[in-house]
Amino acid sequence: MKIGILSRKRELYSTNSLVEACNARGHEVRVINPLRCYMNITSHNPSILYKGEKLEGFDAIIPRIGASITFYGCAVVRQFEMMGVYCVNESVAITRSRDKLRSLQLLARKGIGLPVTAFAHSTQYTEDLIDIVGGAPLVIKLLEGTQGKGVVLAETRNTAASIIEAFKGLEANILVQEFISEASGSDIRCLVVGGKVIASMKRQGREGDFRSNLHQGGSATQVRITPEERSTAVRSAKIMGLGFCGVDILRSNHGPVVMEVNSSPGLEGIEKTTDIDVAGQLIDYIEKNAQPGKTKTKGKG
């Protein structure tokens, strides 16, 4: 097979791991920087060019689209879909998962456990937002934040109101969420491939930090997940329409609650923590499922 990996950085652990898994199985693999692609958008012969060369003959694409390039990266993925190339994660699913508010609304509609979340346009409803999530302490999140950035724990009501008004003064979109204190600064990252949880780890925030992201200095250990947590992760991936993703779950007093569904999860932390060949299992999944034109949206975006 000829497999393309859309990634801006060939040297990243995740990209390297996928390249090695492709090579080990005898596939032709190419790392493509999506920002260096440009497109001929035409009705009968859509194409993608890369430094003057047409990108042709690909059997599958693995999108590794960073949050900062979601718009252009998804346009490139969509173009591959229009050309009939199988994409592990479709453009519409990536876009859906990157919108925190839209994700929560879709998950809520299907009955997935979530932290109580409030959202408003105007600061005149700040007190109501705080009441909706049960008062302080509470969590305030920038909708555009990633890797734990733009996430603040407000310990008191006055602090919460000040932070909300400060963010709104910058015209930032924010979510206000209940603080799950019983999680004690930890979460569960479940990696889902093709509707199955293939690996999971517990991430613990560093001392004094409620954020468990490894990018923020957290640590990781192996964990045995419950059947309910497994079901929650699988259902969340399906609702988002993602063939490959990381589902972040908190253990609350009322069962598992989903914090995020990540369409481009890092492989380093979970592969090193669990000794599971995640990249290899993803390539195995592609081998079984890659067919020309096999997109749920049929390239319609």
UniProtKB/Swiss-Prot annotation:
**Reported cofactor(s):** Mg(2+); Mn(2+)
Which GO terms of the molecular function aspect are on file? ATP binding; metal ion binding; ribosomal S6-glutamic acid ligase activity
| Cofactor comment text | Binds 2 magnesium or manganese ions per subunit.
Q: Identify the residues that bind Mg(2+) 2.
A: E260, N262
Where, in this chain's numbering, is Mn(2+) 1 bound? D248, E260
Pfam families reported in the protein's UniProt record:
RimK, Rimk_N
Q: Where does ATP bind?
A: K141, E178, F179, D187, R211, S212, N213
Q: Which GO terms describe its biological process?
A: protein modification process; SOS response; translation
**Which amino acids does the record list as binding Mn(2+) 2?**
E260, N262
Domain of life, per the record? Bacteria
The record's EC number reads: 6.3.2.-
Instruction: Print the keywords alphabetically.
Output: ATP-binding, Ligase, Magnesium, Manganese, Metal-binding, Nucleotide-binding, Protein biosynthesis
Q: Which GO terms describe its cellular component?
A: cytoplasm
Tell me which residues make up the ATP-grasp domain: 104-287
The enzyme class is ligase
Binding residues annotated for Mg(2+) 1, in chain numbering = D248, E260
Family the entry assigns: Belongs to the RimK family.
Q: What NCBIfam families is this protein classified in?
A: PRK10446.1, rimK_fam
Could you identify this protein by its name?
Probable alpha-L-glutamate ligase
What gene codes for this chain? rimK
